[in-house]
Amino acid sequence: MVDKKANLLWVCSNDFSSAGIPGPSIVPGSYLKGFDLSSGEGKVSAELPGKATLCNDMVVGEDGSLFVTNSLAPQILRLKPGSTQLEIWLENPAFEQPPQGAPGLDGIAFGGDGNLYVDTFAKGDFFRVDVKDGLPGKITKLKPSRPLKLPDGLRSTGGQTFVMVEGGGSVDRVTVNGDDVEITTIKDGIAGPTSVVPVGQTLWVSEGQLPHLFEAAKSGPPHLPFRVIGVPMNK
């Protein structure tokens, strides 16, 4: 995620060795990394606290704090401006993973109302977290117009409208009206989309092909090369 104000590119770096999947290095754990947008130099490396960690999605708040979802614990973490240590901003049983341990909290974005919106990957839930003076308040489980299939990356497009990808293969327009959420599919048939970034009138969607990573014996090798595809926002 690009943070223009801080001049940083924020990314997650995760180790999947606990799931039997070797990573590119021997460094264990899950980290939030910040790189200088101009030089590419690493500026921040913050390890997620705890034993069950999977850095997933992130959003910048009005004060420059970074809010990060942990998919292996019911936690939203916060990195304050100038800090290199993540703290637990909110932990709540509403965000618990399924019993089989599939990923929980995933996409995260602020709405035009100043509140925080998150989705959960395996359970397919969509929540609003009331925010006042930088602190979390009431958590409300919202009502999507149709079931969500592996909701993932979430980004605001202004007001109470968002774009979201579903691991089931679609990128959607998400409109929040009170406790109701209207889901409109913009494009489907995408190979396991994991994230979306709106740039102008184009949505850039990454194809993650996650079944080929986590269910390699069943799904076989991924189809190379991995792609980032452009989707017209108003399609």
Task: Describe the predicted segments one by one.
Residues V118-K123, K143-D179:
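Loop/turn-rich, solvent-exposed surfaces of beta-rich toroidal or solenoidal domains
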Residues S17-G20, L32, P74-L77, G124-F127, ...:
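Structural signal for beta-propeller blades
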Residues D36-E41, K80-T84, D130-L135, T175-D180, ...:
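Short loop/turn segments that connect beta-strands within beta-propeller blades
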